[in-house]
């Protein structure tokens, strides 16, 4: 018997576009995790049309940061700026590949810091975004947010929009967080998450919340509970304390607290200023890892 081979339907390839930032002359590139997640192949195209196949060094879904590597040398790269020094009203530029319009640059100002959006639903999510009005659209994700000196202050990650296109508000992972994540992925293969060992009150402190909790403090981090034998407990932090500063930097909100803590490794000692009974008290806290000790965690740790 003779016949025809059955018709087959090829599964169409899906392609996505995004942006990235070269951060070393030997080819390390930062982008967003959501840009490369579940990709089978990643191609990096430079402004001069040179193409490289990239490999994934590591990812951190909690911050939506991914680190790629291409085999090249002598590449131009961006220097990091200290994102803690960014000021409200400061002029910034967003650089990227929106709608595949290569090397598009838009301008705006910093309109807020330590913004939390709730777009990452994971329990370990870390959102402490820089907010800007520089136009960011699909394809910009993973691209650079730079200051007037051309230094990297953030990785463009998200927009707030009812349509999916720019409507005035865009958000970037601060460079201090991205830099620490990248360093950890390069050195350890995983992100070293430092924990203080407290439960925070679910809402920001306001006069109404403060009255409910029985505290006079209307800003800061209210310590709802302290984990036994955790870093905070060992340092003398108590339930009902209000954290006001970390290493001298004022803390008003949960994203500010998370953003500062994200800069440190387990085993680091930080100075924490708490308000207790109307008085300020400075305590030295030795941060722990997610397993409750001060060791750095190997990526194969189980």
Q: What positions do the PLM features span?
A:
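Conserved catalytic motifs of ABC-family nucleotide-binding domains
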Residues: 240
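Serine-dependent protease modules
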Residues: 1-235, 249-268, 275-280, 286-302
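Conserved "HGTGT" condensation-loop signature of ketosynthase/thiolase-family condensing enzymes
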Residues: 243
């Amino acid at each position: 018997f003779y016949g025809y081979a059955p018709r087959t339907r090829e599964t169409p390839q899906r392609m996505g576009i995004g942006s990235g930032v070269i951060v070393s002359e030997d080819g390390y590139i930062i982008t967003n995790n959501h840009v490369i997640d579940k990709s089978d192949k990643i191609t990096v195209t430079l402004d001069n049309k040179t193409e490289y196949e990239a490999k994934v060094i590591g990812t951190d879904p909690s911050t939506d940061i991914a680190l790629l590597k291409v085999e090249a040398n002598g590449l131009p790269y961006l220097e990091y700026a200290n994102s803690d020094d960014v000021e409200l009203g400061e002029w910034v530029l967003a650089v990227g590949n929106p709608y595949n319009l290569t090397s598009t640059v838009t301008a705006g100002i910093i309109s807020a810091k330590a913004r939390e959006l709730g777009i990452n639903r994971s329990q370990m999510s870390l959102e402490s975004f820089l907010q800007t009005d520089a136009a960011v659209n699909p394809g910009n994700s993973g691209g650079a947010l730079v200051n007037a000196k051309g230094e990297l202050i953030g990785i463009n990650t998200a927009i707030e929009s009812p349509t999916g296109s720019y409507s005035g508000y865009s958000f970037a992972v601060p460079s201090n967080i991205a830099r620490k994540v990248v360093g950890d992925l390069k050195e350890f293969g995983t992100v070293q998450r430092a924990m203080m060992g407290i439960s925070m009150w679910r809402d920001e402190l306001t006069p109404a919340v403060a009255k409910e909790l029985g505290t006079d403090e209307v800003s800061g981090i209210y310590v709802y509970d302290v984990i036994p034998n955790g870093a905070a407990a060992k340092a003398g932090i108590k339930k009902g304390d209000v954290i006001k500063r970390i290493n001298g930097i004022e803390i008003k909100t949960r994203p500010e607290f998370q953003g500062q803590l994200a800069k440190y490794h387990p085993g680091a000692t930080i100075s924490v200023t708490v308000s207790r009974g109307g008085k300020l008290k400075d305590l030295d806290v030795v941060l722990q890892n997610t397993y409750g000790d001060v060791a750095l965690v190997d990526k194969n740790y189980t």
